[in-house]
């Protein structure tokens, strides 16, 4: 079942594209897009398809600034506020789904990391996590990955934003030849994520 809805947030309407498998899922995976991108990025679409095939519900969230037609991203606090409102509403609508996993690509991965604890998520999926700006390598964002939750990071070894280090609760999968867009093998990347979700017991 597929449904697309606008959801009101304190920062304007967002959009949630929700896909549910035929049987009741045990997990809802909520994904956010990159700063200048959208939820139809190849890695997000491939992950949606693979997760659905594994019996996981998937919601891809478009931030209010993109719904309004702007490409320049909103401030981090605004992104977090809108995302939190959308995920909260999705969990209210799908309260029968017991497990929430949040994630996204690039900026969306950062938002998911920053809000995962407050949303009572069980885990985080971070695709193309932008560890540091290419022109400001001293500005590391590694602390955002320290959510205290099981976290999977999938980055390319040619990503100009760098590759995070693994930690006690952070698994890092490095994809050879991939850059920040993760376009070379999105299906393979999706399989890595679903395998990790399966290991955690979050698939059907």
How should these model regions be labeled?
Residues 111-115, 135:
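Hydrolases whose catalytic domains are alpha/beta-hydrolase-1, hotdog thioesterase
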Residues 178-190:
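Catalytic histidine-centered segment of alpha/beta-hydrolase-like enzymes
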